[in-house]
C-alpha cells in the first residue's frame, strides 16, 4: 500500500482506503509476529512507517471502514483524516494488551492524537473494543452509515475533501 501512495499526486485530489467486506483490517499477521523477534520488529517498523505515511500524507485520506478494525486496523483508522464505518455487528479497538503485546510508543502517540481524552485510558490501556456505533465517541470513527451506502458516502466525502485548499495537509 505504501508504494501505491507514492504514486498519488501530492498537489490535488484525495485518497479513499477500504477493506474487504466485514473486515477493514485485522492488523498484523500474528503468526509472523510470533515467529521471531526479528520478524516482529520488522513488521512493527513497516506498520508504523505506513501509519506515519498515511498520517502525514499531503492530501486528505478517507477510510471506508467496511467491518472490524482490530489492533493495527484501529490505528490505521486513527491515521486517516475522515473515517466512515458501517452499521453492523463489528468491533473496533486496540487489543494488543489483551494479547500480551505492547503498543509501540510512536503508534501510541499517533492514536493519542485522534482518540478523545475520556476514552484514551479505556481504548489504549484497557484494550476496550467498541461497537461500530460506539466508535465515534472515542474518536475511531467520524460517522456511521448503512452498509449499502458506505462506498457511495465515502467517495462523496473524498471528492468533497479533494476540493479544499490544503496548506494544512502539507505541514
Model-derived regions, located:
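Well-ordered beta-strand positions
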Residues: 82-84, 122, 126-128, 143, ...
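A structural preference for short, pocket-lining loop segments at secondary-structure junctions
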Residues: 1-38, 53-63, 88-90
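Glycine-rich beta-to-alpha transition loops that act as phosphate-gripper elements at the mouths
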Residues: 64-70, 123-128
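Hydrophobic/aromatic residues within transmembrane alpha-helices
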Residues: 17, 29, 76-78, 135, ...
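C-terminal long alpha-helix characteristic of the crotonase
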Residues: 2, 85-90, 136-171
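Short, well-ordered alpha-helix to beta-strand connector turns
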Residues: 12, 58, 80-81, 141
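CoA-thioester-processing core
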Residues: 50, 70-123, 157
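Glycine-rich phosphate-binding loop at the start of an alpha helix
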Residues: 27, 41-48, 71-72, 129
Amino acid at each position: 500500500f505504501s508504494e501505491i501512495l507514492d504514486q498519488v499526486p501530492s498537489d490535488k485530489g484525495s485518497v479513499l482506503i477500504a477493506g474487504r467486506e466485514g473486515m477493514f483490517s485485522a492488523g498484523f499477521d500474528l503468526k509472523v509476529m510470533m515467529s521471531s523477534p526479528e520478524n516482529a520488529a520488522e513488521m512493527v517498523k513497516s506498520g508504523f512507517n505506513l501509519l506515519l505515511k498515511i498520517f502525514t500524507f499531503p492530501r486528505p485520506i478517507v477510510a471506508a471502514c467496511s467491518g472490524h478494525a482490530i489492533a493495527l486496523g484501529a490505528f490505521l483508522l486513527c491515521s486517516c483524516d475522515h473515517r466512515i464505518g458501517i452499521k453492523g455487528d463489528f468491533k473496533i479497538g486496540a487489543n494488543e494488551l489483551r494479547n500480551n503485546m505492547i503498543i509501540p510508543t510512536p503508534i501510541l502517540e499517533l492514536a493519542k492524537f485522534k482518540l478523545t481524552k475520556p476514552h484514551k485510558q479505556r481504548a489504549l490501556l484497557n484494550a476496550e473494543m467498541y461497537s461500530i456505533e460506539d466508535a465515534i465517541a472515542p474518536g475511531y470513527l467520524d460517522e456511521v452509515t448503512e452498509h449499502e451506502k458506505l462506498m457511495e458516502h465515502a467517495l462523496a466525502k473524498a471528492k468533497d475533501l479533494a476540493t479544499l485548499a490544503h496548506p494544512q495537509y502539507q505541514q
